[in-house]
């Protein structure tokens, strides 16, 4: 059995709640783990199949199962097979039941009911994917927020986080050789926000990125001289726009994104 660890996410609904908790936790360990999501799990047979797959490789199971019988079943199966399993929602539901003296509805997927806010988030996510790393005027015009910055300043993950919160987020890379759309200098509705980062940290991030792609980490893209040129260009561009600037150095995606939200709600 290979020892490369991975995570199974098991849910009787979509599994977004468990996925979000897992992603937030993984980010605290500065690493990446393979994960596989099993959605709409409703039967013991499905649980048995998942457990069987989990035994083939070092696996941690994180689950959100509303049905107490399924929660008990997966916990039992995991113990029998020496698999580490984490119940994300069960303890909270039990605490609520005891504290409020009320029985839960035990209906999977209630948090994702098709209401106005849900459709707003879906629309925002679709928008963000469409205008990721884009220099398109339409993205600037239609976005709730436009993030600008040099490569590897967390523009894309921040936009994804913002879209999950219902904001149409676009991002534009700043590269000295490519002039951004003139529309950002007009900064309509004060929606443009700049991102910056410590050059030495950016150097490390870019080198790691190149290594992961099998490219020489000493290439010009990751050189400190090139990084300083890009950051200087980005700083001048942001000054010309007159937009707020967020330093993302050593900050989590959530922390930086919430600073963006604070600016938007200013």
Curated annotation (Swiss-Prot):
It is an enzyme of class 2 (transferase). Coiled coil: none annotated. It comes from Halothermothrix orenii (strain H 168 / OCM 544 / DSM 9562). Belongs to the pyruvate, phosphate/water dikinase regulatory protein family. PDRP subfamily. Keywords: Kinase, Nucleotide-binding, Serine/threonine-protein kinase, Transferase. Disulfide bonds: none annotated. Bifunctional serine/threonine kinase and phosphorylase involved in the regulation of the pyruvate, phosphate dikinase (PPDK) by catalyzing its phosphorylation/dephosphorylation. This is Putative pyruvate, phosphate dikinase regulatory protein. ADP binds at residues 149-156. InterPro entries: Kinase-pyrophosphorylase, PPDK_reg. The lineage of its organism: Bacteria, Bacillati, Bacillota, Clostridia, Halanaerobiales. One of its GO terms (molecular function) is ATP binding. NCBIfam families: PRK05339.1. It comes from the Bacteria. It catalyses: N(tele)-phospho-L-histidyl/L-threonyl-[pyruvate, phosphate dikinase] + ADP = N(tele)-phospho-L-histidyl/O-phospho-L-threonyl-[pyruvate, phosphate dikinase] + AMP + H(+); N(tele)-phospho-L-histidyl/O-phospho-L-threonyl-[pyruvate, phosphate dikinase] + phosphate + H(+) = N(tele)-phospho-L-histidyl/L-threonyl-[pyruvate, phosphate dikinase] + diphosphate. Its EC number is 2.7.11.32, 2.7.4.27. It holds the Pfam family Kinase-PPPase.
């Amino acid at each position: 059995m290979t020892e490369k660890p991975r995570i199974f996410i098991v849910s009787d609904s979509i599994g977004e709640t468990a996925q979000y908790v897992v992603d937030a936790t993984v980010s605290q360990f500065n690493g990446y783990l393979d994960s596989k999501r099993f959605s709409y799990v409703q039967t013991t047979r499905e649980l048995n199949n998942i457990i069987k797959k989990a035994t083939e490789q070092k696996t941690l199971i994180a689950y959100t199962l509303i049905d107490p019988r399924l929660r008990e079943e997966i916990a039992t199966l995991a113990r029998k097979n020496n698999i580490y399993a984490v119940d994300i929602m069960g303890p909270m539901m039990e605490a609520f039941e005891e504290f409020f003296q009320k029985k839960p509805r035990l209906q999977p997927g209630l948090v994702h009911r098709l209401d106005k806010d849900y459709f707003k988030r879906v629309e925002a996510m679709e928008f963000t994917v469409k205008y990721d790393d884009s220099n398109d005027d339409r993205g600037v015009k239609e976005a709730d927020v436009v993030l600008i910055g040099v490569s590897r300043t967390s523009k894309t993950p921040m936009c994804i986080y913002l879209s999950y919160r219902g904001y149409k987020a676009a991002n534009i890379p700043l590269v000295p050789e490519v002039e951004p759309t003139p529309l950002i200098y007009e900064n309509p509705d004060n929606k443009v926000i700049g991102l910056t980062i410590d050059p030495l940290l950016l150097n490390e991030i870019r080198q790691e990125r190149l290594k992961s792609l099998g490219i020489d980490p000493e290439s010009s893209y990751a050189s400190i001289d090139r990084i300083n040129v890009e950051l200087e260009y980005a700083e001048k561009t942001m000054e010309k726009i007159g937009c707020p600037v967020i330093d993302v150095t050593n900050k989590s995606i959530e922390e930086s994104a919430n600073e963006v939200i604070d600016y938007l709600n200013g």
